[in-house]
Amino acid sequence: TREELTSILYDMLAKMDDSEIFIYWQVTRGTGIRQHQFPAAGTKANLWIFMKPGKHGDSSKRLKLTDMEDTRFLHCNIKTLNLLPNVMAAEKAESMGCGECVFHRGDVVTECAHSNVSIIKDGVFKTHPTDHYILPGITRMHLVQICKDNGIPVDETPFTMEELMDADEVIVSSSTKFCAPACEMN
């Protein structure tokens, strides 16, 4: 239950010596025989938790970006272990001295290898809609809400690479980067 998970996380946090902790947790449907169906009803879920000392991303550090065609399957909104395209894109970015790789399908920007990407143009916060082409990030969700709460117009429609290049600001967001501004592309 939510209460049990909360209790477990607080118990683990109490064992950490740092005041700022990065927490990552996953719940699976449980352990079962290798097959393509879900485990039998009543199978106990597995919980995996990773914690380490860590601070929010440094928003004063501006990222260099690169891009590549998004060839991932059509269910990017589902968190899976099928991350090879993301890993290869992150490696490409790293080898080019970039902090992230922007995925696009044709000319339409989707997201980054392990972050969401949004733009600001003429005072409007624009971000890809939460459809099957992106993993809807928690930080992205909070950014949208903060903009709405502060009267900043939000446009959740697809945008193009040309719009990205012409943006007043490009924001890369994730749980680890928080909100990192981008300064350079390719």
Positions of the model-derived regions?
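ATP-grasp fold ATP-binding core
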Residues: F22-V27
